[in-house]
Structures are given as C-alpha cells and as structure tokens.
C-alpha cells in the first residue's frame, strides 16, 4: 500500500467506520439469543439428558437384567443386582446409577436390547447435595414415567438411524 493510501485511511479512520458499519448491520437483525429460563430451544431427538428406566404399557418394567449396560459403561457408573422370578425370567432388584461418574456417552442406551434404559429430555437436574445424584431404581422409574411420552417420541424419530 502506498504511503498516500495509508495516510488517507488513517486520516478518515477507515477501520473505525468499517467497525461501526458491521455493528449497525447486526443491530437491526433478529436476536439470536433466548431469554433462558423463560424461553427454551427445542432439543434434538438424540439429546442425552437425565437417565430413566422405562416400562411396558401394561406397567411391567422393561429391564430384563441382562447387565449389558453395566458391562458397557466406560465410567462404571451403573450397578445392577438381579434375581430370577417364578416364571424363569430375571428382573432387577437393584439398579443404581452414580450420576457423578456418568459421562453421558449413551452406550448404556445403545446396548440395551429392550430400550429399558434411556437418556431422557431433561437437562435441568442440578442438586444441592451429592447424594441426590445417586439414582436408584425408584428414581429412574419415576423419571421414565414422567418423561415416557417425550422418550417414546424421541425414539420413534431416531428409529431410522438405529
């Protein structure tokens, strides 16, 4: 750049003008931010949130105590104990997830042959104590009951890719 061109740009504060033009360009566009927590963006069907155990429509638990989720968990956050039932099938007596260890990888959901353990749509589960992040079977089933409609819709939307 010539000395004269540099002098003209410096004298007219060309960079200052360009910066203000860019600011004015975006000033009148619609805002990209949302007013959280009063507004919420839609979540992807593949979103990995709070864990839940699902039930069949007749109310029976889906988990067949195969322990694949426990085996595949890289963080070793899942603990399962099972007993055989009178009809010969197995059901869980204890199903615990330590959410302080969980890395939300989704391997447990992928490994489950009956879609019993899923990661639901809830992402707001901050707690005041560490003990509240140790989910037992009752808490997981309650989550499943609470989010069943959303979970079923997300699994149906994701079905072509599974």
Curated annotation (Swiss-Prot):
NCBIfam families: NuoI, PRK05888.1-4, PRK05888.1-5. It is an enzyme of class 7 (translocase). Its main location: membrane. It is found in: Cell inner membrane. Residues 53-83, 93-122 form the 4Fe-4S ferredoxin-type domain. The lineage of its organism: Bacteria, Pseudomonadati, Pseudomonadota, Alphaproteobacteria, Sphingomonadales. Signal peptide: none annotated. NDH-1 shuttles electrons from NADH, via FMN and iron-sulfur (Fe-S) centers, to quinones in the respiratory chain. The immediate electron acceptor for the enzyme in this species is believed to be ubiquinone. Couples the redox reaction to proton translocation (for every two electrons transferred, four hydrogen ions are translocated across the cytoplasmic membrane), and thus conserves the redox energy in a proton gradient. [4Fe-4S] cluster 1 binds at residues 63, 66, 69, 112. It is a peripheral membrane protein. One of its GO terms (cellular component) is plasma membrane. This is NADH-quinone oxidoreductase subunit I. NDH-1 is composed of 14 different subunits. Subunits NuoA, H, J, K, L, M, N constitute the membrane sector of the complex. Pfam families: Fer4_7 (PF12838). It comes from the Bacteria. InterPro entries: 4Fe4S_Fe-S-bd, 4Fe4S_Fe_S_CS, NADH_quinone_OxRdtase_chainI. Keywords: 4Fe-4S, Cell inner membrane, Cell membrane, Iron, Iron-sulfur, Membrane, Metal-binding, NAD, Quinone, Repeat, Translocase, Ubiquinone.
